[in-house]
């Protein structure tokens, strides 16, 4: 412990004031609403395994593994700062949120939402007129019914190219009202009904995930969405390192952290830049040992 604290002090001394006043820009915002969290946790259904935080974690994990910068944003945030907003399980839609999301998408933003969204208002009263309530026009769909699967049950869903995947937990029975289907259920009594949809709204797009897809299908869908939103990873190379960035008007600083127990090669794109913690130039095939950190100045 003493050695670690000593090392930290040395590193902070090396950094000086170089990173003071830097910002951490992100093109992606994940909407996390505490009222929504509490309302969903205390609802009596439709599935015991539906947890708001689990859904937030699943979406965040996708971006984290791709080294895509993300902000966790409240419902009253400035949505215009982002290219892509993810709002999973937006069960409670407060007054003003619908309008803010519509304005965001109209101007070219991409929105991702899905099952159990647009169910109640801020007083926890159910919206009348069908689901997803106030988000119905924005998503271009009407959800007639929600089928809750038992923990051991699975459904099958087919992409338009014929690729099939399994889904679990909840299955929205979706009617298209302007949106197009990206994938349809291929089993159960609602085979042929849309499971995942895409709707053009103004200059932007809304994606609605009406069921919980298996990991490979979820990654495939999110990859397509990220590409459409023109959101890019901080590094072009695939790496297990955590990479974050902080910027000033003049400089860009990359923070590389190896959270694994294996030695990992630093991506080639950083070769020739300066390691602020050592003052040395980053070499090609440079190794970052387990739990080591590099702060690189571009």
Q: Where in this protein do the model-derived segments appear?
A:
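Carbohydrate-binding surfaces of carbohydrate-active enzymes
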Residues: 1-298
């Amino acid at each position: 412990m003493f050695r670690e604290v000593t090392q930290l002090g040395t590193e902070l001394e090396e950094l000086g004031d170089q990173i003071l006043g830097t910002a951490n820009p992100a093109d992606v915002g994940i909407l996390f609403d505490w009222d929504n969290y509490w309302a969903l946790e205390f609802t009596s259904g439709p599935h015991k395994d539906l947890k708001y935080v689990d859904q937030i974690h699943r979406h965040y994990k996708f971006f984290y593994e791709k080294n895509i910068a993300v902000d966790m944003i409240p419902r009253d945030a400035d949505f215009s700062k982002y290219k892509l907003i993810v709002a999973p399980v937006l069960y409670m839609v407060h007054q003003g949120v619908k309008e803010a999301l519509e304005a965001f998408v109209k101007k070219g933003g991409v929105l991702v939402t899905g099952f159990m969204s647009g169910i109640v208002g801020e007083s926890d009263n159910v919206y009348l007129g069908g689901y997803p309530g106030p988000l119905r026009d924005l998503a271009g769909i009407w959800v007639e019914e929600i089928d809750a699967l038992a923990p051991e049950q699975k459904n099958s869903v087919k992409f338009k190219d014929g690729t099939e995947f399994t889904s679990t937990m909840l299955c929205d029975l979706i009617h298209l009202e302007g949106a197009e289907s990206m994938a349809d259920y291929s089993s159960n009594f609602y085979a042929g009904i849309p499971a995942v949809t895409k709707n053009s709204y103004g200059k932007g797009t809304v994606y609605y995930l009406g069921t919980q897809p298996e990991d490979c299908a979820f990654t495939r869908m999110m990859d397509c969405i990220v590409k459409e939103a023109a959101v890019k990873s901080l590094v072009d190379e695939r790496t297990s390192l955590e990479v974050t960035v902080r910027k000033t008007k003049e400089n860009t600083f990359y923070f590389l952290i190896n959270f694994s127990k294996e030695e990992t090669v630093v991506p080639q794109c950083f070769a020739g830049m300066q390691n602020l913690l050592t003052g040395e130039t980053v070499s090609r095939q440079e190794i970052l040992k387990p739990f080591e950190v590099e702060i690189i100045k571009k």
